[in-house]
Amino acid sequence: MALWGGRFSQAADTRFKQFNDSLRFDYRLAEQDIVGSIGWSKALVSVGILTAEEQAKLEVALLALKAEVEADPEQILRSDAEDIHSWVEGKLIERVGDLGKKLHTGRSRNDQVATDLKLWCKQQGNLLLDSIHGLQTKLVATARQYQTTVLPGYTHLQRAQPVTFSHWALAYVEMLDRDYSRLQDALKRLNTSPLGSGALAGTAYAIDRQVLALDLGFDRATRNSLDSVSDRDHVIELMSSAALSMIHLSRFAEDLIFYASGEAGFIELSDKVTSGSSLMPQKKNPDALELIRGKTGRVAGALNGMLMTLKALPLAYNKDMQEDKEGLFDALDTWHDCLDMAQLVLEDLKVNEPVTKAAAMGGYSNATELADYLVAKGIPFREAHHIVGEAVVYAITQQKPLEDLSVAEFKQFNAVIADDVYPILSLESTLAKRQALGGVCAEQIAFALQQAEQHLSTRHK
């Protein structure tokens, strides 16, 4: 039976009921709805609606229902209840009779669902923090494993300057650290309780909402009932955090897809995260990474959909807000799955170090070193840049790397070039010169690893 039927003389059309009902997705809020109901029952004791004995009886029944839901959440979907609130109330009345009908006194589904959703977001957010931390930890371990492995660095997908595989992995640790911080900030902002805001104007009972908020694990109660029941900023913030983090994961996936390609051959992905072709027996496809990349659009699309749903909604609650859950649930589930899959990809990843080193030495990636050499000889950088560009063109025509040109050949471009140029052009010199904070010299890589390991080991959620 619907919770609102008294006003109506006709039953809802079955097509409308199917269109309107939300149990098929908001059943995921069952545990939070029960927890919120227990908190509300305690508040009703404080204003004389329930006796302590009645509250205790309700709490026992609700806790038993919660245990059943935890064991078999799918049971909820076998009901024809309109939503999770109706289902919980119906089950409660089955167990305790008319006493269960007193629980909703002073409460609206508007503040109830807002509370349920925030409780769910807090729970899921903490799980996501753990997953981000786990991936960061795996990236740092990978960086430690390949601390001295040279890798070509790219701009415009063209070889630019040599870096290390460690430096590459630590770049994603930095991105994920921002993701972690953003998610933490979002969780701090949403940690306010709307329960007791009623439908829109506040409850008519003198409930201490601050005590109620603390009892439910929130930092404080919300301050404005109109805003409380219509606020979905936390949904947008969590979906935005998910979308931006998925962009980072997509970049991670794309890098590794390229590195694993036959054209690069830098890494070998484990059989555990790849698949084959039904036609071509030689294929080893990076499906895990491609799915991470593909699912990024799904999460970004969910965010855009939610932004449009909330656009121009008048205060306070509107049924449009029922659309907040499916996109949020899917976005956070997808984000969580992709974080875990990225970690799995790294578990047995192998780097082909001879290939990465040879690639790092190719593509005239030491051209900037030659320009810096000329600057040290007193030539302005812009002029040095032009000279080196001409030297590179010449080396390409001769099918030689810069370091194989003779001094005589170098002097065609500028007379100051001498034998002391060759140590400057070596791969080792190129890496060693990047000594500023955040650079790729051995000392900076070691420092960055130590800092990352310390940061992750001492982090608190």
Curated annotation (Swiss-Prot):
Pathway: Amino-acid biosynthesis; L-arginine biosynthesis; L-arginine from L-ornithine and carbamoyl phosphate: step 3/3. The keyword Lyase applies. InterPro entries: Arg_succ_lyase_C, Argininosuccinate_lyase, Fumarase/histidase_N, Fumarate_lyase_CS, Fumarate_lyase_fam, Fumarate_lyase_N, L-Aspartase-like. One of its GO terms (biological process) is L-arginine biosynthetic process. One of its GO terms (cellular component) is cytosol. The keyword Magnesium does not apply. Belongs to the lyase 1 family. Argininosuccinate lyase subfamily. It is found in: Cytoplasm. Transmembrane segments: none annotated. NCBIfam families: argH (TIGR00838), PRK12308.1 (NF008964). Its EC number is 4.3.2.1. This is Argininosuccinate lyase. It comes from the Bacteria. GO terms for molecular function: argininosuccinate lyase activity. Pfam families: ASL_C2, Lyase_1. It catalyses: 2-(N(omega)-L-arginino)succinate = fumarate + L-arginine. Keywords: Amino-acid biosynthesis, Arginine biosynthesis, Cytoplasm, Lyase. The gene is argH.
